[in-house]
UniProtKB/Swiss-Prot annotation:
PROSITE patterns: SAM_MT_TRMB. Belongs to the class I-like SAM-binding methyltransferase superfamily. TrmB family. Keywords: Methyltransferase, S-adenosyl-L-methionine, Transferase, tRNA processing. Gene3D superfamilies: Vaccinia Virus protein VP39 (3.40.50.150). It catalyses: guanosine(46) in tRNA + S-adenosyl-L-methionine = N(7)-methylguanosine(46) in tRNA + S-adenosyl-L-homocysteine. GO terms for cellular component: tRNA methyltransferase complex. S-adenosyl-L-methionine binds at E75, E100, D127, D150. It is an enzyme of class 2 (transferase). This is tRNA (guanine-N(7)-)-methyltransferase. It comes from the Bacteria. Catalyzes the formation of N(7)-methylguanine at position 46 (m7G46) in tRNA. Transmembrane segments: none annotated. Its EC number is 2.1.1.33.
Amino acid sequence: MTDPFTSDGAKMPPKPFTIEEGRRQVRSFVLRQGRFTPAQQRTFDALWPRFGLDYLGAPRDLAATFGRDAHKVLEIGFGNGAALRFAAQQDPSRDYIGIEVHAPGVGRLLNALEEDGSTHVRLYHHDAVEVLEHEIADGALDEVRIYFPDPWHKKRHNKRRLIQPAFAQLLVRKLREGGRLHAATDWADYAEQMWDVLDATPGLVNRAGPRGHVERPTWRPQTHFETRGQKLGHGVWDLLYDRDSGIGNRESQEQLPSASG
């Protein structure tokens, strides 16, 4: 079957969403929504009722959404969906929620989920901050994954990065105690910012210790881009944080469950 989601099509103007932090607002990320071609729109319309979650702005009963009680894993900014699809294939005992603002990426994953016959994946085509603030109950998530968020590498654009103190505090609220946050980046400067923000966030404990990172976990597949970058000597930083009561010490880390999956 030909995948109609091979082109971004015409671009729509970026539309920022923000989260309050003190007196200023912090962007979560910029909406980069490509317009669908007619073929893409038909495919989207056919598959969205099966796999899509329309943003309603009200708390959602996730157990009812999936028809079962299971661990809930959220991936923010899933791109083309490769990591989310891989995780869902490898561990069908968990329920997966993906959020992505780029329309063709959502469409490609919809096609993949139909091909796999998935029943335990649901997708939002909306801003992550609004979904987290209004649709996900506090303590409802077992894990949050954020892989290779836009680095906004120009210094004047750093304020647009997703990982900011207010956003980290929001994630802590949504994770259950004992839950996990997994972030990955291939930009050294962004890794430094992630450490600055996440290591200082009450309720998060760095699995590798302060300013530490881990080897790529088995549940995150290595991308072609990542492989090419490593051949050129580029680094990749995987950061794992456990959600606890806010006591960030080595003893509390060692008592937490292992990071095997």
